[in-house]
A protein has these predicted regions:
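N-terminal export/assembly segments and adjacent metallocofactor-ligating motifs
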Residues: 1-246, 254, 258, 262, ...
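Conserved short loop/turn motifs at secondary-structure junctions
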Residues: 110-117, 277-280, 303-310, 342, ...
Length: 740
């Protein structure tokens, strides 16, 4: 293994990439405290030496002039920030925070964090807010992307956590990508998928997506499901698998519960109505089912297309039903694999950052779980509230209504990333106190703050994170933090000490990690054997890893035993429900949002890279050519795109790879990059009943030429292979075993 080295002028070390949840291990070199080179680590299990454009351009975005290098405060929102010392900033913030708690109670304050926080920071947040202040009002931007997957795994399989690992790509003979544009959002993992197909062209790659994405361009079968049509499509596939008897009777009998109810539901409902609601021709539905049914090993990657929905948990359940039906789980090359979009979204789940969770996959509404954590934290019985806290959207609604008075925001930019941004901005404006902890200033959110805490970021600190495949990794610093910036956990611990709470006198991140992992012992995410000393030596281990001698676990449920009351996975029949907001005469089109290859989240990093900005310089709206004609638009023209909540002005890109009636806007741009460009001014803040995840993938909009915009010459704004009419695309696979 490579170890961190320094000769006083140059340093090099390994760390986990700070972008998506693939968990690419990177080697970086610095000279005079400036990063000059980054490359993938060849023997790293996640990336095998691979690196995407975002990772490769990290040297361009770390040491920039807009780094937040000193704490800052201001007396009023209309006033200017002034730099202060850490002592002054903490004293000021704690005094105001405590005054609000004293007057309005502990549930009047909240912490809104991120999947970019290290596990050590996540743990300290919970200990402060849930164990000391006495409120469960901590949540994360992971609520916006992963909550439905968490709820889906837990309800179907008994616990959170993806059963497969990346190595399963090499054993799969059918790979489905459902509601994920892996080629742009998780490119290094998708490179492994492409390598698998290159090595064996008979491998199926099936992509289910309303858009012909760069991922769909690589597919042997592209299934253009209607927006919101996933559950009826899954149910229709289940019906065909039952009728063709392409199911695993032995697995169903030995390892599952609820099959009779599922069978009755699937066979009693109208197959034709499911096909119609899916928006997919019946012949294509049958083709999809046949390809899945004949596969010996079937692996499904899925992401925001399933999760970001008011029925996201149900979509997860419906997909898992198909894997249980075919016995495609708990073996090499198989399983439902939820991809995370941030480097430590998994770690936040393990550490209990979400408002209903406690460390070690425990839950605040379970008295035994609360007692376990209170004992570990040396807190009196009853210290942890019995009521789950507010979730992300609920927090901002509570700010707007006055129920919540103060919010501490860390490592995220909700003034761009939250749905219904007009509501979010009204909410933040009404807050008595907004603390923002970030590496950069200004951002759209720091502009609204009262107190700014400067945080060290990637390459500047030691920390731990968990990737999509349950791989726990250590990152080491390559440079020193600028100015007075310090790691997130230190900021939170100092704040807690200022509030008078004990148990926060940590000297190193390793102390925190070693305090945290005993709380996972015996839990589904058991990391008791992944000590800081072992991580420093071995770099990464995959949980469950219960002892210091344990090598880690490649995939879950290989014995067919699940962490449920009867040890069986659950079939959960789910019916089709229309999205919360539907189209009508006034708003006849559907808006969906998503990522681009060149950017990440709200561009607080990628927007500083000249190479990445050159690739994607500005926001746009993609429109099907028939819809463009109907609404009087041509490529390059500025259009006015409006929902019931807001209006944008964006240049048009014509893309026949969209379903008719669907428009697409990337969500990366905010007000700092131009007015009326943030997609989330349009999106709806409707959330699911259990997962509480917002509906980013479906809202009703109208489209028209901007009244004061010049009409350009008709030309395509972009020419790519996906600029072809959308239909189910079939590519015949080739057998590698045929005789010559």
């Amino acid at each position: 293994m490579a170890t961190a080295k320094s000769d006083g002028q140059t340093r090099d070390a390994e760390s986990i990439c700070p972008y998506c949840g693939v968990g690419c291990r990177l080697w970086a070199e610095s000279v005079y405290n400036q990063i000059i080179r980054v490359k993938g680590v060849a023997d790293a299990p996640a990336n095998l030496g691979g690196i995407c454009a975002k990772g490769a351009t990290l040297p361009q975005v770390i040491s920039t002039p807009d780094r937040l290098i000193q704490p800052q405060i201001r007396v009023s929102r209309s006033g200017e920030f002034r730099p202060v010392t850490w002592d002054a900033a903490l004293d000021h913030a704690v005094e105001r925070f405590q005054a609000i708690i004293d007057k309005h109670g502990p549930d009047s304050v909240a912490f809104y964090g991120s999947g970019q926080l290290d596990s050590e920071a996540v743990y300290v947040v919970g200990k402060l807010f849930k164990g000391s202040i006495g409120t469960n009002n901590t949540d994360s931007n992971s609520r916006l992307c992963m909550a439905a997957a968490v709820a889906g795994y837990r309800s179907s399989l008994g616990a959170d956590g993806p059963p497969p690992c990346y190595a399963d790509i090499d054993d799969a003979d059918c790979i489905t990508v459902w509601g994920s544009n892996m080629a742009e959002a998780h490119p290094v993992t998708f490179d492994r998928v492409k390598a698998r197909r290159k090595a064996d062209p008979s491998v199926e790659l099936i992509v289910i997506d309303p858009r012909r994405t760069l991922t769909a361009e690589q597919a042997t079968l592209h299934v253009p499901v209607a927006p919101g049509g996933d559950i009826p499509l899954m149910n229709a596939v289940g019906r065909i698998l039952l009728e063709s008897d392409d199911i695993d009777h032995r697995y169903i009998a030995s390892h599952t519960a609820g099959f009779d109810e599922y069978f009755h539901f699937i066979t009693a409902e109208s197959f034709d109505s499911w096909v119609e609601a899916s928006g997919v021709p019946e012949s294509v539905v049958r083709d999809l089912a046949a390809r899945v049914g004949r596969s010996k090993t079937w692996l499904t990657f899925y992401c925001m297309g399933l999760n970001q929905s008011t029925v996201g948990m149900w979509k997860n359940n419906s997909l898992i039903n198909l894997h249980l039906l075919t016995g495609q789980i708990g073996k090499p090359g198989a399983g439902p694999f939820s991809l995370t979009g941030q480097p430590n979204a998994m770690g936040g789940r393990e550490g209990g950052l979400l408002s209903h969770q406690l460390p070690g996959y425990r839950f605040v509404d379970d008295p035994c779980h609360r007692a376990d954590v209170e004992a570990s934290w040396n807190r009196p019985a009853g210290s942890i509230s019995t009521t789950p806290g507010l979730t992300a959207v609920e927090m901002f609604r509570a700010l707007e209504s006055g129920r919540l008075k103060a919010m501490w925001i860390a490592a995220t930019n909700p003034a761009v990333s939250m749905p219904d941004l007009h509501m979010v901005r009204r909410a933040l404006a009404k807050a008595e106190l907004v603390i923002v902890q970030d590496a950069y200033h200004p951002t759209e959110t720091t502009r609204i703050a009262d107190v700014l805490f400067p945080a060290a970021q990637w390459s500047e600190k030691t920390g731990t994170s968990t990737s999509s495949e349950r791989l726990v990794s250590r990152s080491d610093p390559i440079i020193d933090p600028p100015g007075a910036a310090i790691p997130d956990w230190q900021i939170i611990a100092r704040f807690a000490q200022r509030m008078g709470y004990d148990g926060f006198d940590y000297k190193t991140s390793e102390e925190i990690w070693d305090e945290f992992i005993p709380l996972t012992k015996g839990r589904p995410c058991d990391m008791a054997g992944i000590t800081s000393a072992r991580l420093k030596k071995e770099r990464h281990l995959r949980w469950p890893c219960p002892t210091a001698e344990h090598p880690g676990t490649e995939r879950l449920y290989t014995n067919g035993i699940f962490p449920t009351s009867d040890g069986r996975a659950k079939f959960l029949p789910r019916t089709h429900r229309e999205p919360r907001e539907t189209t009508d005469h006034e708003f006849p089109l559907v808006l969906t949002t998503g990522r681009l290859y060149a950017h990440w989240h709200t561009m607080t990093r990628t927007g500083k890279s000249p190479k990445l900005v050159q690739r994607e310089p500005g926001a746009f709206v993609e429109v099907h050519p028939d819809d463009a004609v109907q609404h009087g638009l041509v490529a390059g023209q500025i259009a006015e795109l409006a929902s019931r909540r807001g209006t944008l002005r964006l240049p048009v890109r014509i893309n026949p790879g969209l379903s008719r009636g669907l428009v697409f806007v990337p969500f990366h741009w905010g007000d700092q990059h131009g007015e009326q460009t943030a997609a989330n001014y349009l999106t709806i803040s409707a959330i699911g009943r259990i997962a509480k995840q917002p509906e980013f993938k479906y809202c009703a909009v109208r489209l028209a030429p901007a009244p004061d915009a010049l009409k350009p010459e008709p030309t395509y704004a972009r020419t790519t292979r996906r600029d072809r009419p959308l239909r189910a695309t079939v590519v015949e696979t080739r057998s590698t075993s045929a005789s010559s």
